[in-house]
Regions:
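Structural signal for interior beta-strand "rungs" in well-ordered beta-sheet cores
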Residues: 161-261
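Terminal amphipathic alpha-helical/low-complexity segments used for targeting or macromolecular assembly
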Residues: 1-158
């Protein structure tokens, strides 16, 4: 009760973006990005174009609903007014990122296939591998976060966390060819920067050394507090790297390492 009493009163009940709605939106986007694999489409090119267009249209309808819910929330807690056309503009910009997102995911899947002799096909990777599921969600969430809908983006990332046990903040910047092997327990913080062709094993943490001091809820300054991992780094299972430290290109970090500097 003390916490509740300390908060500013709300003008109306909070309505947040729906987890179910966003889960379905990501599913539809996955079908559109990989129609012949995740979408299970079979047909000629013209039919495939229609399939993709229908999935994108349905996904954008759901995303529009979620974005409007987030804007209503922020407008209530901060009294910020948003232009009515802003959700449509965000969706337009997000749509423009999808070809780049698809290309990045292709590099991630290729890295997994090269790095795991147990992988029999890229189809198996896209459908079964938790690292592939997590990075697909992250690539989409990262674009949404950059476009100014952090709650929508965070829900997308948490859907992946629930499914895979891999926790990647949508603010984290991750280069091409990213491979999380096994994946359970991996944590990547908001301001982490990861280069190209990086491989992480299970239970790796790229975290911050200290939490924010107790402060009133609301907008906070976002400062760089998570590691920088340069190109071609391998970090083995159970290692914890905290703070704004830099892991140089080509480094190999052994298992169960605790690294602060």
């Amino acid at each position: 009760m003390a916490w509740r009493q300390a908060q500013p009163s709300r003008r109306q009940p909070a309505i947040f973006p729906s987890r179910t709605t966003l889960g379905r939106a990501v599913e539809l986007l996955s079908h559109a990005l990989f129609p012949g694999r995740i979408g299970a489409f079979a047909g000629d090119a013209a039919a495939e174009d229609r399939f993709v267009a229908e999935r994108l249209d349905a996904a954008f309808t759901l995303l529009d609903e979620a974005i409007r819910a987030e804007f209503a929330y922020w407008q209530d807690v901060s009294a910020i007014d948003f232009a009515p056309e802003r959700p449509a503009e965000i969706l337009r910009l997000f749509a423009g990122t999808l070809s780049r997102v698809r290309a990045l995911i292709d590099t991630d899947v290729a890295a997994i296939f090269r790095g795991d002799p147990a992988a029999r096909s890229v189809d198996e990777i896209l459908i079964c591998y938790p690292g592939a599921v997590a990075i697909l969600h992250h690539r989409l969430a990262h674009e949404l976060d950059a476009l100014g809908v952090p709650i929508v983006a965070r829900i997308v990332s948490e859907i992946a966390n629930e499914r895979t046990g891999i926790d990647i903040h949508p603010g984290a910047t991750i280069g091409p060819g990213f491979f999380i092997d096994h994946g359970t327990g991996v944590v990547i913080g908001e301001t982490a920067v990861i280069g190209a062709r990086v491989r992480l094993y299970q239970h790796v943490t790229l975290g911050a050394r200290t939490p924010l001091a107790d402060a009133a809820p609301g907008p906070r300054d976002r400062f760089a507090r998570h590691p920088i991992v340069e190109d071609d780094v391998v970090i083995y299972a159970g290692s914890t790297i905290l703070g704004r430290v830099t892991i140089g290109a080509g480094a190999v970090i052994g298992g169960n390492v605790w690294l602060l500097e």
